[in-house]
Regions:
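Classical eukaryotic N-terminal signal peptides for Sec-dependent ER targeting/secretion
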Residues: 1-35
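Primarily extracytoplasmic ectodomains and periplasmic/lumenal surface modules that are beta-strand-rich
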Residues: 74-78, 84-90, 95-100, 156-158, ...
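Noncatalytic modules at the cell exterior or secretory-pathway interfaces
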Residues: 148, 250-251, 320-339, 458-473
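Short acidic/polar inter-strand loop motif in beta-rich domains
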Residues: 157-159, 181, 339-343, 471-480
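Short, surface-exposed beta-strand/strand-loop-strand elements in extracellular ectodomains
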Residues: 267-275, 422-434
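Beta-sandwich interaction modules
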Residues: 300-326, 444-462
Length: 621
């Protein structure tokens, strides 16, 4: 008979004689697992390496996920720790974190026996056993902390009911079963306590570079913040470097998360303030507070960024990020995103980021360059669109003028949109042909942004083109969404981290404003409703008056695909490189990259035909 823990369901408390003896020995201690898997269904042993990545799944910390990645086997090994299991648990993945149409693995009991099986949910949330069992249970055992489940899953399975594990963001889902179910098909996710967590599962397999012997550390931490009892808080804190702090290179950084707050701290960033201001007012409070000094908006140069699930970030051995010294601001802004769905009150936090730096400057300064779209309302997404694409260009003319003859090397990337962004990709093109992807996230979420190290350094030569495309979903909006700085406006940016440092800080584009006005005139001509084209009307006002029928949508989409662009090929001083940058033709691309083909694992036939029955006995808690 299956028994799950101190909160076991009543139907599961009638012990067999052996369990009754165990119960008499251990009293009311938390029940534990000694799992014996059917020998024929035992999988191969997990990799010897530990599980380097770990995140809490739920805000209470009941479920904790660890994992490692084998690129050779194209397999992820998961270790799920369940601290207070009642009658079962489900775990899985879905396109955007929804529990419907999800790829799941479920541990459940019918009150007598326990089962582990690959499953999926339909559009109504009903769970079904998958005909192809691709999650393979390797071990289940008791630990001092709770039940530990070890299982594996290939990246791709060629099962239409399974999620394809790719580079980029993965939306993990979970659910807690509080009572037995006679069958898996009796479970509907709507009746469960559920949630989601975002993470990058396929971390790059990069060797750690050698660190300098004179390396020192600096901690940029929140000053014992009383975390507000609300779901979302962005906390801003201004600090400063010591007087006379000379020029150094940051060579790595890592998160510092206050113990017990692992499920609260969602992501953190350290920004350097603009050197043009001699001082910045000290501040510690919510970033959206009316008390926040306006000057803090000039602290936007990213030094470090961390998100849940990320480990330490290392710069390449030959490069470091410069900070301190002449021409560099002493003032830093720490921003911490607290995700507190349980509205916990009274929790204090001192989380932050630890910088590792050296006075022995490396061969190259690292730099950060902005790719994508200029922050301007001329780039807009019509309402009620589910997959509208906008594209920004860093043209061959700009890279030819601004990059050194030997080019630059991109080693990391941070993608960025506002609330309607769903996909982001940057592609490098050379001689009219797309050559390689710089960074891609087909499941991008604006609520999960981190600097990601690239699996392979991308070299950009003078004359190359960098094309950044963002896909948006405005299905719940009634008006057009225009580009801009506001959270309800949109952005399309890739902050690429590269070396050696150049003067080129921003390489972005937008449609030529004059051609956009021709669009508004065309809309006037072919629609009974008039769109204001008078000079005093702003572009957002003009977009707000467009009747969004199919014709107007298609014409706008076409305009963005052929109209000339205004290029921003800017130095760090925000001044453009010398040249003519308006009315520039779109880069001509004669050959595009092929979409990757799905690989079906050869070991597919070894998977069990049905769920694994788990035989359970008692043990000491």
């Amino acid at each position: 008979m299956a028994r799950w823990g101190g909160q076991a369901h009543p139907a599961m408390r009638v012990p067999s004689p052996s369990v009754r003896e165990a119960a008499s020995m251990y009293g009311t201690a938390v029940a534990v697992f000694l799992v014996i898997l059917v020998a024929a269904l035992q999988g191969s042993a997990p990799p010897e390496s530990p599980f380097p990545y770990r995140i809490p799944l739920d805000p209470e910390g009941i479920l904790e996920l660890s994992w490692n990645v084998s690129y050779v086997q194209e397999t992820v090994h998961f270790q799920l720790l369940v601290r207070e299991l009642k009658a079962g648990v489900l775990f899985g993945m879905s396109d955007r974190g929804e529990l419907e149409n999800a790829d799941l693995v479920v541990l459940w009991t019918d009150g007598d026996s326990a089962y582990f099986g690959d499953a999926w949910s339909d559009q109504k949330g009903q769970i079904h056993l998958d005909a192809q069992q691709d999650y393979q249970l390797l071990r289940a055992q008791r630990t001092r902390e709770g039940l530990s489940l070890l299982f594996k899953r290939p990246f791709g399975t060629c099962d239409p009911k399974d999620y394809l594990i790719e580079d980029g963001t993965v939306h993990l889902v979970y659910g807690i079963l509080e009572e037995p179910f006679q069958s898996l098909e009796a479970i509907n996710v709507s009746s469960l306590q559920t949630g989601l967590q975002r993470v990058q599962l396929l971390k790059p397999n990069i060797s750690i570079p050698a660190l300098p012997s004179d390396m020192r550390t600096m901690e940029i931490r929140a000053p014992d913040v009383l975390v507000p009892g609300q779901e979302t808080t962005y906390w801003c804190y201004i600090t400063e470097l010591p007087d006379g702090f000379s020029r150094h290179h940051i060579v790595m950084y890592e998160p510092i998360v206050t113990e017990g707050n692992e499920a609260l701290v969602h992501h953190m960033e350290v920004f350097q303030c603009a050197a043009e201001f001699e001082s910045f007012p000290h501040f510690s409070g919510p970033c959206d507070s009316k008390m926040k000094p306006e000057r803090l908006n000039y602290c936007r140069h990213v030094l470090a960024a961390w998100a849940l699930g990320a480990k330490a970030f290392y710069y390449p051995e030959e490069a470091g990020l410069a900070f301190g010294g002449p021409g560099s601001s002493r003032f830093l802004r720490l921003e911490v995103h607290y995700h507190n769905p349980l509205m916990i009150k009274g929790r204090r936090d001192s989380s932050g980021i630890r910088l590792y730096y050296t006075a022995t400057l490396r061969r190259f300064d690292a730099g950060i360059m902005e790719l994508g779209l200029v922050y301007t309302p001329v780039m807009a997404i019509p309402p009620r669109e589910t997959a509208f694409v906008l594209t920004g260009y860093c043209t061959d003319k700009c890279t030819q003028m601004a990059l050194p003859p030997s080019g630059i090397h991109i080693f990391a990337s941070q993608l960025h949109t506002h609330l309607t962004g769903r996909k982001v990709v940057t592609v490098l093109a050379r001689d009219g042909r797309e050559k390689e992807v710089v960074n891609r996230d087909d499941h991008y979420s604006p609520h999960f942004q981190e600097i990601r190290m690239l699996k392979k350094v991308v070299s950009v030569h003078p004359g190359d083109v960098l094309i950044t495309s963002c896909t948006y979903n405005t299905g719940d909006r009634k008006l057009a969404t225009v580009g801009g700085f506001g959270i309800l406006e949109e952005m399309c940016v890739n902050y690429v981290h590269y070396y050696p440092l150049t003067q080129l800080e921003l390489c972005k584009s937008a449609v030529d404003p004059g051609f956009l006005q021709k669009y508004f005139h065309l809309v006037n001509r072919f629609n009974s409703e008039e769109v204001c084209t008078c000079p005093q009307a702003s572009v957002p006002e003009q977009f707000a008056s467009v009747p969004w029928n199919s014709f107007n949508r298609q014409v706008l989409k076409a305009l963005y695909s052929f109209a000339p662009i205004s290029m921003h090929c800017n130095k760090s001083s925000a001044v453009r490189f010398q040249g003519e940058w308006n009315l520039q033709p779109l880069p001509e691309i004669i050959s595009k990259l092929e979409e990757p083909t799905r690989h079906c694992p050869a070991s597919q036939g070894q998977s069990p035909a049905g769920p694994t029955m788990v035989s359970i006995g008692g043990g000491k808690g």
